[in-house]
């Protein structure tokens, strides 16, 4: 397996995948410009044992929450992509449950949302609107993953060569015994794999029919509150085995009739069986703040107007996945008024001008406009 992963063809194909969308970056340009020579050098280094994993750089991510991630050298990204695509991913995901929805080919947020609606409709046809939702969110999932647990999972599910190469990369890039910073595909695979035994436990031991896990977010639908409390308690016990704990604010049991929030959308099941799926209010608020900053930059000539439209169209495409017609109409009107200057005029504050250094000004016009919408 090692010979296949480090072969010229495998590494070259991995380079072609890794460069998509990032060829404008200088390190990528430099590597790809002499791609054949660099790939051949990598191949020989793996053959004669002189290959060394590079040191990643820490970068700060601020949205949707502040956290640290790792930026990996391009040559290491090529090598890791070859491991993932040719061996690690196929072997690790082979035993996943259908309801494990994150970071897999043919799956993702859209798949998970569709599965939620499918489960809700199936449940409604059997039991109506009476039911209970169990939601569990793990606090600091990546930062609290034990290295020994991840390596044990890889060792149990993959061949010897894949285990040695994968664990070697993780050990070189992450010091200590606990915690991984997101930023590489290999860490994502570790994230979706670590709790695979818990997925099977929920399905096969607790006999839960309607359950979904998206990375560290659990969504479970059961018939009675007693069942919900039992499932919730068992999940808490299982998480302790992995040294993980639930986020108290985001982990709870709620009646199905009250609705719930999952993956950025609010869901509500009506008495007639209709599933109402609306965009989370936090997303709308964030979009409005972003539009204020971008429009002001555009008015100062620092940003092309087309970039504002491109950003907003992307947000609308996501909103279209739910019942968001009225929200879209209000946001479009808000954007038009921003461009006309009816709400803000020349008044700008630090948050509106992306840190331009100006002092804060009264926001009465802005508050009045938001009240109207």
Task: Put a short name on every predicted segment.
Residues 1-150, 158, 170-174, 365, ...:
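Conserved two-metal-ion catalytic palm core of "right-hand" nucleic acid polymerases
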Residues 45, 114-215, 219-238, 254:
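Conserved polymerase palm-domain catalytic core
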Residues 56, 212-216, 248-249:
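Short Gly/Ser/Thr- and Asp/Glu-enriched loop/turn motifs at secondary-structure junctions
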Residues 72-73, 77, 81, 172-176, ...:
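Right-hand nucleic-acid polymerase module
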Residues 81, 85, 192-197, 250:
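Short, residue-level hotspots on alpha-helical faces of the histone-fold
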Residues 83-86, 235, 239:
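PAPS/PAP-binding and catalytic site of the sulfotransferase fold
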Residues 93-94, 204-210, 243-247:
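Surface-exposed helix-capping loop/turn segments at secondary-structure junctions
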Residues 102-111, 219-221, 253-259:
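Beta-rich nucleic-acid/ligand-interaction surfaces
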């Amino acid at each position: 397996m090692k010979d296949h992963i480090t072969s010229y063809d495998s590494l070259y194909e991995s380079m072609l995948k890794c460069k998509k969308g990032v060829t404008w970056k200088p390190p990528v340009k430099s590597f790809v410009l002499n791609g054949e020579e660099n790939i051949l050098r990598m191949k020989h280094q793996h053959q004669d044992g002189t290959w060394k994993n590079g040191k990643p750089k820490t970068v700060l991510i601020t949205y949707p929450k502040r956290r640290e991630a790792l930026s990996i050298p391009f040559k290491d990204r090529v090598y890791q992509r070859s491991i993932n695509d040719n061996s690690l991913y196929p072997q690790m995901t082979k035993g996943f449950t259908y309801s494990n929805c994150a970071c897999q080919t043919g799956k993702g947020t859209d798949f998970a949302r569709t599965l939620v609606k499918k489960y809700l409709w199936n449940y409604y046809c059997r039991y109506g609107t009476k039911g209970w939702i169990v939601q569990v969110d793990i606090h600091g999932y990546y930062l609290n993953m034990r290295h020994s647990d991840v390596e044990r999972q890889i060792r149990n599910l993959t061949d010897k060569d894949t285990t040695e190469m994968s664990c070697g990369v993780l050990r070189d890039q992450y010091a200590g015994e606990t915690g991984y910073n997101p930023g590489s595909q290999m860490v994502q695979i570790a994230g979706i794999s670590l709790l695979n035994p818990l997925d099977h436990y929920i399905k096969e031991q607790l006999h839960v029919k309607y359950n979904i896990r998206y990375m560290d977010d659990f969504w479970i639908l059961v018939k009675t509150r007693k069942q919900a409390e039992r499932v919730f308690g068992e999940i808490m016990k299982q998480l302790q085995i992995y040294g993980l704990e639930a986020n108290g604010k985001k982990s709870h049991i709620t009646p199905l009739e009250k609705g719930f929030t999952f993956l950025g959308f609010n869901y509500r099941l009506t008495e007639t069986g209709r599933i109402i799926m609306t965009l989370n209010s936090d997303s709308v608020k964030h979009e409005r703040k972003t539009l204020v900053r971008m429009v002001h930059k555009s008015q100062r000539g620092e940003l092309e107007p087309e970039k504002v439209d491109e950003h907003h169209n992307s947000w609308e495409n996501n909103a279209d996945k739910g019942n968001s017609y009225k929200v879209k109409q209000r946001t479009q009107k808000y954007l038009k008024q921003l461009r006309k200057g009816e709400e803000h005029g020349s008044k700008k504050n630090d948050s509106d001008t992306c840190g331009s250094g100006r002092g804060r000004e009264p926001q009465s016009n802005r508050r009045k406009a938001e009240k109207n919408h």
